[in-house]
Amino acid sequence: MKPKVQNLIFDLDGTLLSWGHEPLPQTVTFLKELQKQGFKITFATGRSHILIRNTTQFIQPDLPVISSNGALIYDFAREKALHMTQLAPQSVVPIMRLLLQLEESFCIYTDKKVFGFEKPGIPCKRLRTTQSKIVEPDITQNNFTINPLTDASKFDFATQNITKILLITEDRGRISKITKHLDAIENISYVSSMTFALDIMHKDVNKAYGLKALEQQTGLDPQMTMVFGDGDNDVEIFNAVKYSVAMANGSDLAKQNATFISEFDNDHDGIYHFLQCFLKIE
């Protein structure tokens, strides 16, 4: 009996996107054909919705997207947030204090903007590269700013809806040390979605939490849904749907929790090859 799948949800970095940070042409063409056949496509990513917009220029999602690891559900069709779970101010204070002590670059994601912070005189290449990928209207609206780290102490977080704080470090060994300090802060969760990054959110937030909010907004059926991902932050959503696919380049934890593992990685049309076989579409 042919599996019933109506909805396809894709992580972005390391999954739908190649290492060149864009979806591959063969995969794009194939997914657009699936959309014509009635499949519903959307994304579930640690990225801010502002940093998803450039991908929507290749593939327009049929459903609202799960952004900030599940903290924000954003509908590009209506340009509005449908659901949001923010970090409490009493949690943000000790997080900010810790980050300033560490003197590492970081980003604050809100429902409207991304605020990046870097050491004065020491540009953070990852921050600069990410900022260069934003598209209109976010460029004109100045929705991604990069500021001196010293300005973070003056950031008025009490007036912002903060969905995620992203630590960026070139020293992978620091992450385990940082998490020990984060364990002492109440009502937060964290996950390392990439080797150089640590995502900090509200304690209830993960991609499965975001999926539940998407279900409530759209009526999406998780039993007719397939999710693709590659990272540790995909584990919860893998376990919340009928079918899950870890990319060939995925983490060990992602592969252990997936229904399937793709034969090819994100740089070799892994999604295209898997779906062509799974759906038996020529």
Swiss-Prot record:
Required cofactor names: Mg(2+)
InterPro entries for this protein: Cof (IPR000150), HAD-like_sf (IPR036412), HAD-SF_hydro_IIB (IPR006379), HAD_sf (IPR023214)
Protein EC: 3.1.3.-
GO cellular component: a single term: cytosol
Any Pfam family: Hydrolase_3
Keywords: Hydrolase, Magnesium, Metal-binding
PROSITE patterns the record matches: COF_1, COF_2
Positions with a binding annotation for Mg(2+): 11, 13, 230
Membrane spanning stretches: none
GO molecular function annotation: magnesium ion binding; phosphatase activity
Binding site for phosphate: 12, 45-46, 207, 233
Active site: 11
Family assignment from sequence similarity: Belongs to the HAD-like hydrolase superfamily. Cof family.
NCBIfam families in UniProt: Cof-subfamily, HAD-SF-IIB
Name of the protein described by the UniProt record: Putative phosphatase MPN_383
Organism: Mycoplasma pneumoniae (strain ATCC 29342 / M129 / Subtype 1) (Mycoplasmoides pneumoniae)
